[in-house]
Amino acid sequence: QYVLNDINLLSWMGFFSMGCILIGVLLVPLTVKCFGKKQVYLAGMVLWAVGDILNYFWGSNSFTFVMFSCIAFFGTAFVNSLNWALVPDTVDYGEWKTGIRAEGSVYTGYTFFRKISAALAGFLPGIMLTQIGYVPNIAQSDATLQGLRQLIFIWPCALAIIAALTMGFFYTLNEKRFALIIEEINQRKNKEIETEEKTASVTL
């Protein structure tokens, strides 16, 4: 509305963004099967960052803005779809590491931090808009428009890159390792059952 002076663009953005998100969500099972959760998650982050950075530098008209935004929304579809899919993996990893299956604690912690992030997402933009001098329903200054573009594109892009780097370097739970972890957990459970059966037979 303020950057491109095209109020009708909002309706087109809603249509195309939902379409790209829907296509991305439908492709998640196939891409995960072919490449694994981690790689698909990273690819989604990269697409998100690329779409935002392209929009910041070259999204100067309605067509390029929608096109680059679709790239970003397509990437977020993979990221948002896999957020919940990665949680059960951490539950199994925790059980393998500690011997305790803390499923309730993991999901509770994840839900808690999602609520914290949602609260911050509603609180921080208001402060940042005030800092750049944004006043709704009036013509914005060049400095304010530049600040809006940074808020919309640069900050999300930077956070997506940080998340991708963190995931790439510190998250080592790929499909091959996860399969070995599940196998070891099952072996432990089988041994526990055998031990219990032997103990019961001796008692009898």
Regions found by a protein language model. Name each.
Residues Q1-L204:
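Membrane-embedded alpha-helical bundles of multi-pass transporters/translocases
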